[in-house]
Every structure is written in structure tokens, then in C-alpha cells.
């Protein structure tokens, strides 16, 4: 990556955060997030006063509020900013970003977040970004489950599901999941993108 873009590699989150005006993370879950922030080599040890830390992890609202308070006590700001859009959205810089936190740091961070997003919105105080992401995940889980059941029903009925989706995707059943996931689901290909285990984690 650094062969193509300017930057440097750090051995630890603590090293990476030194002297940064903006800090960004995106890890797997609450435990991972706690380790890279509050752990022995966590970024909270070196984040400078006045800096803004933006976390794109899908985590709990509780840890978001915890990190917000801890950041405030150390003189810098924290925004919980989970993302939606999947691998393709990340690679294309067209993610949706749901933000919780204070308005002043949000306004400062917005132009930076805009580099990898198509929609950014401050949704309320700390934790609001994570709560909004939960709404998002509940909607997606229901849509994917419904699409899976529908494809299975249609295939068992002997229908050409590519033709079926072509038709019904132009009606009230249309969704982003239908448009972007039906081909691989029909072909039984599930070796990329967002893992089911991560969705289970989000819905707990």
C-alpha cells in the first residue's frame, strides 16, 4: 500500500497514533476495539490532545460511550462511525457512515470521512452511530433471509431464478441485496464479502 500512497507502517496502535490529527480504526468486535485503544499498546496512550479519533468498527453502543468518556478525559475527541456498503463500497470509496458524537469534532472530521463515503450523517450523541448500524443490520438480515428463502423456493419449483429476479427486481420486492447478491446466491457461491458469523455477532 505504501508503495502507491504516502504513509508509513507502525508496529502498534500506540505508535500509529503518535502526532496524528485524525486517527481511524476498523476492527472486528468490542474486544478487538478495546485492545487497540485501551490495551498495553493501545492508541489512547499516545493520542495527542485536540486530535479526533474516528472508529469505523461495528461494535456496541456501550463501548462507544466508554471510549467517548475516556477520550474526553485525555483531551481528545471520539466519534463512533460504523460503516455500511461492504467490500465493494470500501474499495470504491462509497461507504455509508453513521456517526455518533459531538458536532464540533464531527464537522472537522467530515471532510476526511468524505474521502471514503457517499453518505455521512451525525445521528446523535456518542453511541448513536452504533445504534443506527444495528437498525441497518436488522434490516439487512431480514432482507437476506427473505431473499434466500425465496430463491430456494423458486429453484425447488423449477423456475429459472435469474429470469425471476430480473422481473421481480423491477417491482416492490426490489432491494440492494437482491440486485447485488442474487447471482452468487443462485450459484451457491459464498466465498467473499461479509461473513455470516459477523452478522451473528452484530445481531447478538
What is each of the regions a protein language model found here?
Residues 1-5:
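NAD(P)-binding Rossmann-fold cofactor-contacting core
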Residues 9-77:
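Rossmann-fold NAD(P) dinucleotide-binding segment
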Residues 27, 53, 58-138:
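Rossmann-fold dinucleotide-binding core
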Residues 129-140, 187-197:
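A short glycine-threonine-serine/GTX helix/turn-capping micro-motif
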Residues 159-172:
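Small-residue-rich helix-loop
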Residues 174-204:
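Interdomain hinge/lid region at the active-site interface
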Amino acid at each position: 500500500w505504501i508503495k502507491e500512497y504516502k504513509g508509513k507502517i507502525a508496529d502498534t496502535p500506540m505508535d500509529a497514533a503518535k502526532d496524528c490529527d485524525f486517527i481511524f480504526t476498523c476492527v472486528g468486535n468490542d474486544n478487538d476495539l478495546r485492545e487497540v485503544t485501551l490495551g498495553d499498546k493501545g492508541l489512547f496512550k499516545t493520542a495527542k490532545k485536540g486530535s479526533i479519533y474516528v472508529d469505523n468498527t461495528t461494535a456496541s453502543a456501550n463501548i462507544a460511550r466508554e471510549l467517548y468518556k475516556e477520550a474526553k478525559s485525555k483531551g481528545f475527541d471520539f466519534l463512533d462511525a460504523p460503516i455500511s456498503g461492504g467490500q465493494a463500497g470500501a474499495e470504491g470509496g462509497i461507504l455509508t457512515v453513521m456517526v455518533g458524537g459531538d458536532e464540533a469534532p464531527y464537522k472537522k472530521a467530515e471532510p476526511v470521512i468524505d474521502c471514503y463515503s457517499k453518505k455521512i450523517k451525525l445521528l446523535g450523541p456518542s453511541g448513536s452511530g452504533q445504534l443506527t448500524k444495528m437498525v441497518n443490520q436488522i434490516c439487512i438480515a431480514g432482507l437476506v433471509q427473505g431473499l434466500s428463502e425465496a430463491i430456494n423456493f423458486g429453484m425447488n419449483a423449477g423456475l429459472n431464478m435469474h429470469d425471476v429476479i430480473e422481473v421481480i427486481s423491477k417491482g416492490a420486492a426490489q432491494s440492494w441485496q437482491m440486485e447485488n447478491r442474487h447471482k452468487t446466491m443462485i450459484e451457491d457461491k459464498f466465498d467473499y464479502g461479509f461473513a455470516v458469523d459477523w452478522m451473528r455477532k452484530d445481531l447478538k
